[in-house]
């Protein structure tokens, strides 16, 4: 049973009438451009065919009813006419409440709604299950009530809800790619202007995501430290962000910087350049060059930004040994565990899966999770 069929069936059973719309919003993986977002730089994600699906219908009053199929059909109810506050027990409900609350601040011309939500974006794998939920809820209200909001505004609304209502600091990339993703394309995003450019993906290439299942512990504190080091670097160059520093300017004075800060700055400057070049390589179908750029990105994250762990490096090496120069592989996400992403010719996927199954657990004692994805369409009706 598809998520669409599941949510429509649950909707009819729970609310006693059929849903009028079914909306989906996808998760994402970032192909290249790591830790560049908060430095006003470039990222190159694609939406994946794992998504949050909501069957819904407008109500003729001001009540919102939400059922979470993936949380034992828990039900949340609240009114649009009362202040929207955090739910005491259901964390999932706060993503919904936050999106609705912030949407009211943007455009309050919508009424009540019934929703049943289900998703298959793996949670805790860094594939943006929360952004997918936020964008799905925003799209539901935009579609049901014909709100004059575009995908970028729905994405910004989701980011605000996560930052201010849920209380989790995040950039804009995750929501933006979920809202604006394009089938068979990646999206080059300028994190300063929020400008986007669709980049066609080569035919016959699979997007493979492998979760190391190494439990991330340092990610919060180390993330903040990296951010501070980048801000220190920008101040040294008297610029608002590292986006505004050239590699030539850096090389001329790198010896004057604190050695650790210099390494962090070098990663951001080179990663930005790699990300822009990667968009061109992908568009031209040059998988060999894309693979080189992904390898350079991984080495930079390992040696200059120091955010990989041995388990992740092991996974990358296993995959690289199979694909050679026919594709690319690197860590993706914040670091200290999580996932790797690989662009692999479809015919090599079984060999990669076999090599990882045979070697990764033997070397690390941890069993991986393997996902084969397609670059998918952003949020909309399904």
Curated annotation (Swiss-Prot):
Major subcellular site: cytoplasm
Record's catalysed reaction(s): alpha-D-galactose + ATP = alpha-D-galactose 1-phosphate + ADP + H(+)
Any one GO CC term of the record: cytosol
Domain of life: Bacteria
Disulfide bonds: none
Sorted UniProt keywords: ATP-binding, Carbohydrate metabolism, Cytoplasm, Galactose metabolism, Kinase, Magnesium, Metal-binding, Nucleotide-binding, Transferase
BP GO annotations: galactose catabolic process via UDP-galactose, Leloir pathway; galactose metabolic process
Listed InterPro entries: Galactokinase (IPR000705), Galactokinase_bac (IPR022963), Galactokinase_CS (IPR019741), GalKase_N (IPR019539), GHMP_kinase_C_dom (IPR013750), GHMP_kinase_C_sf (IPR036554), GHMP_kinase_N_dom (IPR006204), GHMP_knse_ATP-bd_CS (IPR006203)
The protein's annotated pathway: Carbohydrate metabolism; galactose metabolism
Residue numbers binding ATP: 124-130
Enzyme class at the top of the EC tree: transferase
Effect of residue 371 to H: Displays relaxed substrate specificity since it gains kinase activity toward sugars as diverse as D-galacturonic acid, D-talose, L-altrose, and L-glucose
One GO MF term attached to the UniProt entry: magnesium ion binding
Cell compartment(s), UniProt: Cytoplasm
Site residues, Transition state stabilizer: 28
Catalytic residue positions: 174
Annotated positions binding substrate: 34-37, 223
EC number, as in UniProt: 2.7.1.6
Positions with a binding annotation for Mg(2+): 130, 162
Gene3D superfamilies, per database record: 3.30.230.10, GHMP kinase, C-terminal domain (3.30.70.890)
SUPFAM superfamilies in UniProt: GHMP Kinase, C-terminal domain, Ribosomal protein S5 domain 2-like
Family label: Belongs to the GHMP kinase family. GalK subfamily.
Record function comment: Catalyzes the transfer of the gamma-phosphate of ATP to D-galactose to form alpha-D-galactose-1-phosphate (Gal-1-P). To a lesser extent, is also able to phosphorylate 2-deoxy-D-galactose and D-galactosamine. Is not able to use D-galacturonic acid, D-talose, L-altrose, and L-glucose as substrates.
Name of this chain's protein: Galactokinase
Gene name for this UniProt entry: galK
